[in-house]
């Protein structure tokens, strides 16, 4: 089964990275977190606990806007936690929404709720004393934050398509089952945060193992023709195949991922490989087989090279696929036909086949806060008080008020309009996205969320000047090469390099099935806009009918396509 292109070993020998020691010594993710909670001398978690809390859905951060000032005053950084909820498929009840709204107001520094492009929400600025109450509040309304970060299967995404209600419901149920099946089995989360008793049994992790996965692992369930979840950014993807509106099985695609390391040619973005079709009866077996193969074969000697995409490139997709078949006791059928036509959200009211109405609201950057002229956060809380359906968070950082009966439509719309939740914005703004970056993300090299709104305004001006103001280009900004903003699946992707400076990538497409190539490196906003002015001008004049900007940049030879990223991503 070997292939000359993939000569690598199944297991990489060598000195394990320190994260492997940390996991092994953590007593199944307990570490000293419980003791650290009572240490009032510092606002943060110390030593191994700083990393272990990630398995419990939290990152330790500080406010980078005031970091230098505090250092000058000989003060510690102002530590606070970011907490990310586990919310497979992004669906919440109004009761859950009201609970998180109140917590954000009462118990976080910033008072905001951040919707993310992984279909969940984050709290930023939770002080150490409020961490345990945060987990307990989630538990009281049937939520948790287990395994939303670090070396586990993260929050499972599912296409947000409320119109095809029956098919979406079936896909969503599978997203939930996958999430539950691949969760850590340790009782550490319940013991530490929910005060559940320590049971005198030995912990076991039959799927994840004692040292969990080599690196983060991301899963999607996607319902064509909508690629709103950006499947090619993920390790394991189940593409729904329907017959007569009912789900019959899935195509499996494995090994996508966007994270890179500036200047490290051994890292690259990669689209997922098609493995084949499988019936519903085999989904959990196959998912477990993919995860355990990556668990056993993934590189534990180099975290920069540990994700599933690198394992596939080292051993070869066919070898990896054969191992999955062996472990799952099945053989993939040939891929069944599927097509993507869109990945953006459909804004405004749409009526589902169940005769319920669904209102998709554009939430710029996913940040819900009460702005002076637009009390967005209060508006959603007011809607939650009367809404009879559910809320659906999308992978584009927006929110759907779903399942509204005809009799309630007018009341919901009145609240949305009066709180600034239904303002008219351009198609360009609707199709632009950024990660959080400054001031809270410790990895950010450049601004993203705070940079995007005014940058889009300037891009809109360029598009209007060239007569294409009613069109859109998928535009994304990510503050560092880890790529949370998914810029490396955009038509125009900006990757933060240093404060005020970005690498400009061009040549992705509208549906998210192509990696863009770096066009210019380490340039500032004015240089980016000058380049875009020239290229958007050319696109407006030279494009074919219905040709997207990314497709045009390839056809016109502005950039060469990335065809085999392990070998040509950096060319």
UniProtKB/Swiss-Prot annotation:
Keyword match RNA-binding: no
Cofactor remark: Binds 1 siroheme per subunit. Binds 1 [4Fe-4S] cluster per subunit.
One Pfam entry name: NIR_SIR
Molecular function in Gene Ontology: 4 iron, 4 sulfur cluster binding; heme binding; metal ion binding; NADP binding; sulfite reductase (ferredoxin) activity; sulfite reductase (NADPH) activity
Source taxon at top rank: Bacteria
Record-listed siroheme binding positions: 484
UniProt keyword terms in alphabetical order: 4Fe-4S, Amino-acid biosynthesis, Cysteine biosynthesis, Heme, Iron, Iron-sulfur, Metal-binding, NADP, Oxidoreductase
Top EC class of this enzyme: oxidoreductase
Binding site for [4Fe-4S] cluster: 435, 441, 480, 484
Similarity comment: family membership: Belongs to the nitrite and sulfite reductase 4Fe-4S domain family.
Subunit architecture: Alpha(8)-beta(8). The alpha component is a flavoprotein, the beta component is a hemoprotein.
Official protein name in the record: Sulfite reductase [NADPH] hemoprotein beta-component
Organism annotation: Erwinia tasmaniensis (strain DSM 17950 / CFBP 7177 / CIP 109463 / NCPPB 4357 / Et1/99)
């Amino acid at each position: 089964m070997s292939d000359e292109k993939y000569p690598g070993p199944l297991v990489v020998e060598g000195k394990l990275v320190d994260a492997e020691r940390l996991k092994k010594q953590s007593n199944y993710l307990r570490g000293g977190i419980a003791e650290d909670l009572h240490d009032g001398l510092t606002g943060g978690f110390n030593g191994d606990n700083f990393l272990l809390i990630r398995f419990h859905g939290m990152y330790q951060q500080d406010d980078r806007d005031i970091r230098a000032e505090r250092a000058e005053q000989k003060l510690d950084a102002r530590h606070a936690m970011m907490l990310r909820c586990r919310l497979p498929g992004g669906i919440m009840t109004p009761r859950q929404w009201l609970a998180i709204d109140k917590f954000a107001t009462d118990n976080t520094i910033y008072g905001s709720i951040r919707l993310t492009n992984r279909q969940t929400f984050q709290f930023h600025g939770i002080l150490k004393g409020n961490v345990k109450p945060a987990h307990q509040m989630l538990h009281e309304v049937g939520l948790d934050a287990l395994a939303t970060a670090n070396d586990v299967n993260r929050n499972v995404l599912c296409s947000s398509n409320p119109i095809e209600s029956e098919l979406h419901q079936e896909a969503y149920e599978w997203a939930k089952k996958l999430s539950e099946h691949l969760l850590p089995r340790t009782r550490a989360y319940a013991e530490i945060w929910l005060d559940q008793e320590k049971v005198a049994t030995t912990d076991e992790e039959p799927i994840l193992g004692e040292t969990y996965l080599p690196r983060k692992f991301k899963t999607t369930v996607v319902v064509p023709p909508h690629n709103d979840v950006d499947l090619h950014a993920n390790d394991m993807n189940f593409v729904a195949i329907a017959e007569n509106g009912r789900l019959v099985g899935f195509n499996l695609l494995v090994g996508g991922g966007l994270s890179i390391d500036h200047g490290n040619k051994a890292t690259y973005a990669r689209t997922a490989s098609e493995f084949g079709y499988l019936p519903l009866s085999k989904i959990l077996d196959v998912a477990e087989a993919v995860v355990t193969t990556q668990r056993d074969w993934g590189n534990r000697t180099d975290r920069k090279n540990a994700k599933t995409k690198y394992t596939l490139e080292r051993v070869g997709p066919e070898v990896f696929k054969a191992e999955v078949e062996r472990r799952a006791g099945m053989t993939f059928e040939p891929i069944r036909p599927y097509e993507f036509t869109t990945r953006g959200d459909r804004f405004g009211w749409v009526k589902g086949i169940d005769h319920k109405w669904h209102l998709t609201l554009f939430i710029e950057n996913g940040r819900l806060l009460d702005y002076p002229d637009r009390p967005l956060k209060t508006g959603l809380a007011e809607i939650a008080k009367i809404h009879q359906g559910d809320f659906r968070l999308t992978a584009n950082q927006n929110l759907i008020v779903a399942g509204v009966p005809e009799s309630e439509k007018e009341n919901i719309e009145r609240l949305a309009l009066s709180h600034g939740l239904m303002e008219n914005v351009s198609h360009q703004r609707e199709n632009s996205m950024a990660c959080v970056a400054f001031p809270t993300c410790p990895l950010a090299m450049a601004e993203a969320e705070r940079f995007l709104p005014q940058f889009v305004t300037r891009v809109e001006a360029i598009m209007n000047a060239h007569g294409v103001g009613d069109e859109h280009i998928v535009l994304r900004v990510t503050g560092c090469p880890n790529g949370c903003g998914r810029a490396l699946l955009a038509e125009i992707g900006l990757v933060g390099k240093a404060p005020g400076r970005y690498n400009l990538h061009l040549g992705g497409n509208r549906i998210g099935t192509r990696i863009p190539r770096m066009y210019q490196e380490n340039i500032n906003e004015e240089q980016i806009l000058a380049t875009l002015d020239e290229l958007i001008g050319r696109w407006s004049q030279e494009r074919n009918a219905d040709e997207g900007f990314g497709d045009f940049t390839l056809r016109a030879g502005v950039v060469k396509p990335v065809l085999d990223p392990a070998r040509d991503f950096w060319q």
